[in-house]
Amino acid sequence: MNHCILRINILLFVLIADIDVQAYDRIELAGDVLVVALPVAAAGLTLDFKDGQGTLEFGESAVLAMGMTFALKFAIDKTRPNGGNQSFPSGHATISFSSAEFMCKRYGWEYGFPAYTLATFVAYSRVEAGRHYPIDVLGGTAIGIVGSYLVTRPYKGWNIQPEAGHSYFGIRLNKSW
């Protein structure tokens, strides 16, 4: 699977680096590419692991998170920095962090850490491009993480995850059957 992730990263780099546009547009484009790549990678992991339950859980978590996001978008109808509507919460941040949390909780930090890094870039790109305010992407981030956390269970086998509390930091080792 690591070869698959490497190929995706190389493809994304070539797509982003080969386009002759301003840096501002590249950041937005990179975020737009990654917002598709992250859920594709999450779904791809479930297929690579032959994990039908994981496929179902990823679908449920994505539908839950995006359902909450769209309900809030229509209920709040906040104006975007560029004058558009439905700014809060960011759908890009929601699905990116939903995918990252799914990969982290289901398959462990070795998949979750890179996914969280890319999801953070997606959120940054939305603010940098003038599509959202920081509070919009923070709202989307929270919804995405909570939506996946509530639905996703660790994959059978060993799972290593970082853990932090009020007065400690450590590593949690889980075994699922």
Which residues does each predicted region cover?
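Hydrophobic core of alpha-helical transmembrane segments in multi-pass integral membrane proteins
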Residues: 37-46
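Interfacial segments of alpha-helical transmembrane regions
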Residues: 45-64
